[in-house]
């Protein structure tokens, strides 16, 4: 082997070897244990970022480790290729989304190969290809036939100037990103899939996902939001209209003092017909899109309708208000307000001087003070007529029973989860396979006309989808009748909800999935991706799997057994103030810093000599210009170094702080391993290790080796604490560096140690380990080498080093047999000269013995 570690040479050679040998190509082998490891597929944005590198390195480490355990390992990759960014880039670059996307895929594919990830490239998919989305379209038509797909009107962001629908990210401060026109909310027909039909399954099956992070499962439980309560009907005074609300707190029902309805509620429209001020307020509410997450912190606004509801149990009139915090798409679009016992209702009532009626006592039996806030705890009822004195459970049931008995209430289980709206008024997506006949009938596109192919040779004007601006595209015939195609495209979460299953049979053309292949590989054994996907992608991913199961395509209930959510990658962020006081962000690569003795940045200057302000560590992003290009780092240090740093710098699920000094440290370690291997191989071949004749020092080193193997095996396989696995290997290499290399047995032990270290490092740094394995004359390629197994007998200690204290002060150390009794240890201690002199002429009054570690003799 060459003396110097040159990653640029060995990495290219090893990658070529993998490509020529098709090392990572796999097929189904029914007699062999399978392992399916998958990282979330990337969007082909143009270049990999460090977040990608971290995600895919984790997946590759797990895949290579499992392969060394003898399993048939599938690790595929593909491209989540549809989406809005391609449309913006196409307009900006005066091209179409397709060529921009395919060029990005080619570039990023090469970047992935440079990082040495062991993918089966024969299984690569791009979700924008018709041979992929045709089956998605086919499946949608089957869901429609089963009654799981429907169309209804739903609100979208509408730019009246461009006459187009805008995605949420295209609305900036309430205005169109392109022309700055104020955006309106508009109701248009859209397609939905009934995810609510699977709400209970999605909730209950979370309990079976024992190897998913608790945080993800909690987020999904909250998103599904199962609640038990009562749906209650109010009569509207002086009207035949009725008003329905849902509550999980019927115990507070006697404290209702007003009812709030959404701006889109029919009663709101009815009241606004003769009330221009109310009509304006409703328009304001409907044109302001508020994310549900912001509901708690936004300013609560409302306006009285002039209508009243009749409380069904006490007959009192309660005012009906339109409120901006009530959403039409949630529940019934109306809520009963109990300001005495709900903080939001209290704030609204206080703002508009509405009545507040307490009906729940404090825990000590006193009446609550509602002057500063609502009393939201559960307790015994008062002010509630026949229900006074009842506790929460008794009151819940008594009031619910009374409402049911009177025919104005119904016990219901409700879900926060809403059906999945899959229509997008964009071009770059899979066309929705539905057509409208001349008589207005809407039917699925017949199977023999699938796929409905998205035209790729289009001109983007940045305003209207080419599918909508070209009426000829929509024209088709079905059974000889003229028909119009749907011009909306699928939400891109559709493609990423089933790609993992298509990887099992990407070339299969007889159906959506090849049952034999899908059921051999599925479920995924290990899924790796960011926690930001917890309630969108990961919910749809689980839902789609259950849909495919119920269609007979797969047999498992869940798509992935184990989930690892890697943390974000952070980097230093710097800026200076521009001429208008705005922050101009400077790349950390272009900044020189001075640090204090604790390593804190105290001064920073950019490469133009400007003082810049340090804004701390933040997530790598384009907006803060603090992304580090992985390719630059690979060219500078090698892929193995970048991979090693990514796995060592932080636990996988925690944030990782990018520090180039840490990358340099990883590089130094690999150079040290290379140098130790080089010096060892330069001395020629080694003899066989004779375990029976090892000295105590040699036994100690071999014990450390096999303890390290046991720890690294557990850290990678069970605990997934990859950073501690690497730390253990580094510690072992430090011990090896200090070990003598004089005798044949010394060198034989070094050979055993290096062969084990190279295999343990291989999942992290495969290129250098491939090369070192050959230099050390390991059997075959390391790609097919087995994972090292800890020798239990080597880890057994023949002797123990015991510290001897007299009256708590250390007076000596003795070596005793590992199984020595306390009496034997005391005898041996008494023979130790340094100890014996402190025992001369005194009486041992007490003995404290910690087996195999410490002997403390208390004398007097």
Swiss-Prot record:
Keyword Ligase assigned: yes
Instruction: Enumerate the residues binding ATP.
Output: 622
Q: Where are the transmembrane segments?
A: none
Report the PANTHER family cross-referenced here: LEUCINE--TRNA LIGASE, MITOCHONDRIAL (PTHR43740:SF2), LEUCYL-TRNA SYNTHETASE (PTHR43740)
Q: What is its EC number?
A: 6.1.1.4
Domain of life, per UniProt, equals Bacteria
Q: Which GO terms describe its biological process?
A: leucyl-tRNA aminoacylation
The family annotation for this protein states:
Belongs to the class-I aminoacyl-tRNA synthetase family.
A GO cellular component annotation here is: cytosol
Under CDD domains, the record lists: Anticodon_Ia_Leu_BEm, LeuRS_core
State its location(s).
Cytoplasm
**Keywords recorded for this protein, A-Z:** Aminoacyl-tRNA synthetase, ATP-binding, Cytoplasm, Ligase, Nucleotide-binding, Protein biosynthesis
Locus of motif 'KMSKS' region: 619-623
Which Pfam families did the record assign? Anticodon_1 (PF08264), tRNA-synt_1 (PF00133), tRNA-synt_1_2 (PF13603), tRNA-synt_1g (PF09334)
* HAMAP family membership: Leu_tRNA_synth_B
From which organism does this entry originate? Pectobacterium carotovorum subsp. carotovorum (strain PC1)
Major location category of this protein: cytoplasm
Motif 'HIGH' region positions after renumbering to this chain: 42-52
Report which reactions are catalysed by this protein: tRNA(Leu) + L-leucine + ATP = L-leucyl-tRNA(Leu) + AMP + diphosphate
Q: What is this protein called?
A: Leucine--tRNA ligase
Q: Which GO terms describe its molecular function?
A: aminoacyl-tRNA deacylase activity; ATP binding; leucine-tRNA ligase activity
InterPro entries assigned: aa-tRNA-synth_I_CS, aa-tRNA-synth_Ia, Leu-tRNA-ligase, Leu_tRNA-synth_edit, M/V/L/I-tRNA-synth_anticd-bd, Methionyl/Leucyl_tRNA_Synth, Rossmann-like_a/b/a_fold, tRNAsynth_Ia_anticodon-bd
